[in-house]
């Protein structure tokens, strides 16, 4: 923000501090997401925010950005066994993998005619032929869809899957990913002491997303896979790679 008028920024900062500081659910202030708060211009903006928080709301923690020193955002979609290799990271602040959500809830927001040919959702024409489906697909990016379907193909045939088939397969594939991820991170204790999967719950109806609970409040299989890793006594299989191929 080198060219941003800092007096305007400071007025906006103060307005939002006064607006939000009495909210009991507010636990921490954060300057932003996945940007460099120390670069020219950004450092001045973060300094103004930090100074005003120290004056007007000094009881809450302030983080310049996420991730910052000691934390990491990571999306190694291919193999969750990689997480065990992050043994020097104190806190994994954001990570996860896509899956299709509950079919019954999807049918409430997407026309039946669009719930076909889902195996080709990374094709160029998919957006034109499935506008409602794509509209409710959180962070739709054709380059990432094959990774989700590749993982699901280990569970079932993804050539021309029915909605129920692709939902079950992607959720189980993602659930396996979350389980191995959590086990790997927990095994790095006491260096790694925190894991925050992205995201716990979507606030609106979605057909596919990185989430544990969909917008209708329905937990995906990923929720239960992850929850199981926090049982009092949990046994894990320590493998170098989840997938092996000749």
Language-model segments: residues:
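Alpha-helix N-cap/helix-initiation motif
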Residues: 1-2, 167
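Active-site mouth loops of central-metabolism enzymes
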Residues: 2-3, 173
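Alpha-helix capping and helix-loop boundary segments enriched in small/acidic/polar residues
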Residues: 3-7, 37-41, 213
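Alpha-helical scaffold elements lining the catalytic groove of polysaccharide deacetylases
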Residues: 4-18
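Alpha-helical scaffolding segments of alpha/beta enzyme cores, especially the outer helices
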Residues: 11-15, 44-52, 180, 221-228
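Active-site region of glycoside hydrolase catalytic domains
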Residues: 14-128, 191
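Substrate-binding clefts and catalytic carboxylate motifs of secreted carbohydrate-active enzymes
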Residues: 29, 83-246
């Amino acid at each position: 923000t080198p060219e941003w008028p800092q007096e305007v920024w400071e007025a906006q900062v103060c307005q939002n501090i006064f607006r939000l500081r009495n909210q009991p659910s507010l636990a921490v202030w954060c300057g932003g997401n996945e940007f460099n708060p120390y670069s020219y211009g950004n450092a001045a903006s973060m300094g103004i925010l930090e100074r005003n928080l120290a004056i007007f709301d000094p009881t809450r923690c302030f983080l310049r950005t996420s991730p910052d020193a000691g934390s990491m955002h990571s999306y190694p979609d291919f193999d969750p066994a990689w997480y065990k290799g992050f043994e020097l990271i104190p806190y994994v602040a954001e990570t996860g993998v896509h899956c299709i959500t509950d079919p019954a809830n999807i049918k409430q927001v997407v026309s039946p005619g669009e719930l076909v040919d889902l195996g080709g959702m990374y094709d160029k024409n998919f957006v034109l032929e499935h506008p409602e489906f794509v509209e409710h697909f959180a962070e739709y990016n054709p380059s990432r869809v094959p990774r989700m379907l590749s993982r699901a193909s280990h569970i079932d045939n993804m050539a021309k899957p029915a909605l129920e088939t692709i939902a079950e397969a992607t959720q189980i594939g993602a659930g396996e990913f979350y389980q191995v991820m959590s086990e790997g991170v927990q095994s790095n204790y006491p260096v790694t002491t925190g894991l925050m999967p992205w995201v716990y719950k979507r606030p609106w109806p979605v057909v596919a997303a990185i989430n544990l609970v969909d917008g209708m409040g329905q937990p995906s299989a990923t929720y239960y896979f992850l929850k199981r890793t926090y049982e009092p006594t949990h046994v894990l299989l320590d493998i170098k790679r989840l997938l092996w191929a000749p």
